[in-house]
């Protein structure tokens, strides 16, 4: 949007190569996206629907963290994407960090498959089937100085061990499978992750958590800083998880992304849940969700 509003001419560079320059008036959104990704994208948000589980996979009651979270309640189901919307500082990331055991909580209960759990650290969260793709992939999601091979196994190293030793054959086979299925552009599984583009780094993070065999996948700003083509590939991963019956939670500051991919949306403000909106609700639109994010009440 900023390009069309501010620029006189637009140049597209893809994979380090010059593609095309045109006057802005000669571009439209579709042609620009096609030039950026090298192929036509018929649907920017390829939403697919899974079978909603009968009971919530994750249930949170009265979650509290001093000065940050004030009685957060929500339910997340298998076979669905639960979107979290809100302004910066609304408490969305803080809620997920608390559930994941990255930050201590002062009160509240967390249930997974109907059983109350006490999660004090990320390892306990992983053992309880939670995967957390953080918004800071470089600082918290990856070891940039290490290879793709190493990063892919970090969430579940036991899966790749024979006794006390790593099974290198299994690591390579799994890594090559993820490179192919996630379309990671790399010359080798031994490429240093820090040398990859942002979109390919994000795919490595996703591959790492797919190896964790989780039931609950938390995506925090999953498409921030990646190109349009890579975004669609991330959405397709979410779709495959949903169709496999997994519980997917997506935090996003992009309203079209929230509306395009979510089955339900939790709206937060100031560490509290202001509204929960189903996809078939009359309030499932940008205006009403933003109204709730600003503290307004949704009637009916």
Predicted features along the sequence, with ranges:
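Glycine-rich phosphate-binding loops of nucleotide-dependent enzymes
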Residues: 1-300
